[in-house]
């Protein structure tokens, strides 16, 4: 499949603009223009702090954040997708941890470790999530898609993981005795609704302009 750009297909930029203006004037929302397949953003942040409380106790803190998104666009020789029919696939991950190591004596050491990781994944139309999905079966000889993809109109996943570990180590002669505790908890939120704001099909551009849909579903 191609990128869906107007200069790679039979449809012209003027025709794309005409469909766009019809949609704005008749339906009150902007399907945007020609989609780009190269738009992406990435941002990373990290922090580490080592702190010596005293000669027997040491604390280490780590934090890392990664956030990015990429525009996913479609297209073919017989189909044209407006930018609103593409989607941003975004993901943000925050991870933090803290470790406390304590030397209680020459023979006894304790470690307490806690970490939290949260990940939010989204798939959103550049036009926003409150726009319908339109497709026109024949507009200038092509099938044209506008608005939020029916599988991206409400698509979100959020996960959070908490991990706690406590460990006690005792050295006696040639032996090492350990005792510990570990616990992991998960919290998951998943939202998925097909065609949240409706799906309209139009047989032709004239029907689209006349607001005459051949089918409608929600």
Where on the chain are the PLM-derived regions?
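Surface-exposed beta-strand-turn/loop segments characteristic
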Residues: 1-41
């Amino acid at each position: 499949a191609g990128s869906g750009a107007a200069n790679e297909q039979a449809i012209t930029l003027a025709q794309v603009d005409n469909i766009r203006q019809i949609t704005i004037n008749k339906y009150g929302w902007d399907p945007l223009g020609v989609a780009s397949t190269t738009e992406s953003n990435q941002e990373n942040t990290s922090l580490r702090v080592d702190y010596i409380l005293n000669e027997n106790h040491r604390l280490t803190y780590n934090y890392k954040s990664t956030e990015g998104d990429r525009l996913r666009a479609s297209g073919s020789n017989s189909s044209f997708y407006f930018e609103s029919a593409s989607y941003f696939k975004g993901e943000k991950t925050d991870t933090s941890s803290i470790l406390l190591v304590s030397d209680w004596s020459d023979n006894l050491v304790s470690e307490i470790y806690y970490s939290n990781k949260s990940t939010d994944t989204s798939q959103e139309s550049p036009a926003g999530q409150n726009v319908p999905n339109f497709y026109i079966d024949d507009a200038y000889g092509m099938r044209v898609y506008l608005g939020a993809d029916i599988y991206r109109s409400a698509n979100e996943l959020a996960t959070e993981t908490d991990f706690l570990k406590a460990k006690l180590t005792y050295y006696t002669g040639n032996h090492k005795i350990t005792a510990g505790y570990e616990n992991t908890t998960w919290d998951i939120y998943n939202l998925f609704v097909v065609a949240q704001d409706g799906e309209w099909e139009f047989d032709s551009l004239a029907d689209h302009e006349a607001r005459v849909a051949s089918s409608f579903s929600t």
